Amino acid sequence: MKLSNVFLAAVVILTCVCVFQITAVPFIQQVQDEHHVESEELQENQHLTEAEHRLTDPLVLFRTKRQSHLSLCRFCCKCCRNKGCGYCCKF
């Protein structure tokens, strides 16, 4: 009985060692993967800061010259002294 328990324990340990060796990543590859992840994060952060800069840029918030050929009227109710619904051009 003891011999079978020792044999079973040896088989389990040997199996674990084999599995861990197969799934192990070499140190050089792990360092390269970490460097690749860091460079991707840096690129993402740089892209986000550019997007935030475009959103907070005050020149973006100002309207450009209005096109004179575009109508600035819209259909609305109870606006521009209209008692009912109609076109309002106060914009």
Curated annotation (Swiss-Prot):
Family from the record: Belongs to the hepcidin family.
One example GO MF annotation? lipopolysaccharide binding
- Membrane-spanning regions, if any? none
Q: What is the lineage of its organism?
A: Eukaryota, Metazoa, Chordata, Craniata, Vertebrata
Query: Does Coiled coil count among this protein's keywords?
Result: no
User: Mind telling me which GO cellular component terms the entry cites?
Assistant: extracellular region
Q: Which cysteines are joined by disulfide bonds?
A: 73-89, 76-79, 77-85, 80-88
Q: Which InterPro entries match?
A: Hepcidin (IPR010500)
Q: Name one Pfam family in it.
A: Hepcidin
Specify the protein name. Hepcidin-2
Q: Does the keyword Flavoprotein apply?
A: no
**Recorded name of the encoding gene:** hamp2
Q: Give the GO biological process terms.
A: antibacterial innate immune response; cellular response to progesterone stimulus; cellular response to steroid hormone stimulus; defense response to bacterium; defense response to Gram-negative bacterium; defense response to Gram-positive bacterium; intracellular iron ion homeostasis; multicellular organismal-level iron ion homeostasis
Which keywords does this chain's UniProt record carry?
Answer: Antibiotic, Antimicrobial, Cleavage on pair of basic residues, Disulfide bond, Hormone, Secreted, Signal
What does it do? Seems to act as a signaling molecule involved in the maintenance of iron homeostasis. Seems to be required in conjunction with HFE to regulate both intestinal iron absorption and iron storage in macrophages. May also have antimicrobial activity.
Residue ranges the record assigns to the propeptide: 25-64
Location(s), subcellular: Secreted
Give the signal peptide, or none: 1-24
